[in-house]
């Protein structure tokens, strides 16, 4: 985006955005106060298995999805069309595998760290190696999850990147540190609602700008962006029913089979059946985000089909068109830009808090307790877990 193209932020927008951060932080303070007499490691990492299943389902809808799904799916539809929607089939199949193949194994183990499985099956060294790779991978992933939305925020507002990143990361660290897994789950539930509200807002306002959603659909159809039945077996074809369904199935199965954040939540529930219900319950929220992102891509194409921002030099690549559309469509409506910015940053917050909680659990369970000279008390483990959250935050 050009340096001189920034979004006009009114005081109302700042208030809307700030409220998002304040509410997320307040969740941490609430659970820190409510559980002040239950300060133990089991409560911090698994909520004593007394977490609302619906909240866990909503939390899972966000914790597995990449933070940039909103921007990337919309850009994909803008460039290549709606075939991307077939990833929903892969999501369905991957969810089934997670609920009925992976979750029963890890739930019955009843361990905070999922990498205990590797020690039982293969020995101590493979467990340590897998845990180490997980730590490195997660730090890199959540760093990128923080960087990309904050970069879009800077491009739209002109606020320096480091300030946005520092504030967002500090908010995440605060509510994760104070409230543990309960705060993470309920904060993500709040962030999910903000994300849905923001996406509906840009979809509605964008549709109005092009003469209605069906007008946008008609324009996209004329320019061959509406496509659902590409059954080609040519491996050079970007998107086909088979490629998306099968490819996303393996990706999503990995999310349920080797993702500490996901399995930590599922194993924080009272029974295996509840855990399986939660895995299935995460599917509607995930599909809703993907569908709204796809529809936003259709509207985005209709809005810019006669003046492609990349060709005109307004942006460098298609991933920047979504933030540009916010600038063009919403800049004159106080409050709405703040909601969309909150939507983007909420997507980052959910990924970061999930990662911090998972990193803390793995560090303590796999690298501190096994090498401790004597058994650690609950109080010591809790203190070390919180230090691990702060340390992970500093690395990010």
Q: Can you describe what each PLM-predicted range is?
A:
Residues 61-62, 85-177, 226, 247-255, ...:
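Helix-loop-helix module between adjacent transmembrane segments
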Residues 2-70:
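Membrane-interface "cap" regions at the ends of multi-pass membrane proteins
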Residues 25, 29, 152, 170-177, ...:
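Alpha-helical transmembrane segments of multipass membrane proteins
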Residues 2-10, 46-55, 72-86, 119, ...:
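Loop-to-helix junctions at membrane interfaces in multi-pass transport proteins
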Residues 121-128, 138-139, 162-165, 364-396:
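Loop-to-transmembrane helix boundary motifs in multi-pass membrane proteins
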Residues 31-34, 43-47, 61, 75-76, ...:
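Helix-loop junctions at the membrane interface of multi-pass solute transporters
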Residues 21-24, 63-64, 91-95, 134-138, ...:
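Residue-level recognition of pore/gate-forming positions within transmembrane alpha-helices
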Residues 306-309, 315-353, 369-387:
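Membrane-embedded translocation segments of transport machinery
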